[in-house]
Amino acid sequence: DGVMFPNFDDRLRAAMLEETSLFFESVMREDRSIMDLIDADYTFLNERLANHYGINAPDGEPIVGDAFRRVSLPERQRGGLLTQASVLTVTSNPTRTSPVKRGRWALEQILGEPPPPPPPDVPDLPEDEQAVSSGSIRERMEMHRKNPACANCHREMDAIGFAFENYDAIGAYREKDGRFEIDPAGEFADGTRFRGAQDLKRIIAQRRTPFARCLTEKMLTYALGRGTESYDRPVVERIVGTLEANEYRFSTLVAEIVKSDPFRKRRGAATLADAE
């Protein structure tokens, strides 16, 4: 929404996308751990995006110009994909953040646990001025958790999404949502608590296996040109095990996919018929 976010223009949009592209490229080309995608101590910024983030160069000098440069992150409001403006913006609504979209994205794209589709006829949150001023987004979303049909999925999905409430709808850091205090704390379905985005990233990076499995499945899908099936599961698990034994290096992921049977041996019509 150009009225609510006048600083969001084509230059900022392009800078957001370039940061993510350069960051992923660095993980790949430098053969870094795939866990850097969850949290890292560096990113790539130009003047436009650095101003948006409120980040200076390590020497304290402002970052100047349109060219992107690698920047160390002395404080950890940023780091990894989850707190990059590109992801935070695409998982927001036009006028506000969306804990549901952000939580769903993290479950699907990071943890590999996509929630089921919502039941029919669930109303959207009212967006009129009176509703918005009546309480924080967390308070207004309590309606989802009061509906038994929504409660199970929204309990974890919303909690993960709320962890990113310190970032507004275009990914700028904030301490308050309007006049309301932000509470980014939550917990996973297993009861593990986190205090906000940094804590959430730390827990995901420590657990490692769910993200490694999720990324393996997505990379394998890309390599095969099809979705993974139940018969691919042993291959996925073998790749995850090899990743663990090799410090989760990106090159290990690529090499193991290329060496895998699903990649090397195309399933023919007869084989598929037998499987059915």
Regions of interest found by a model, annotated:
Residues 251-252:
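Alpha-helical scaffolds flanking conserved acidic
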Residues 1-221, 233-245, 255-276:
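Active-site substrate-binding loop specific to GH73 endo-beta-N-acetylglucosaminidase modules
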Residues 223-227:
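Core structural elements
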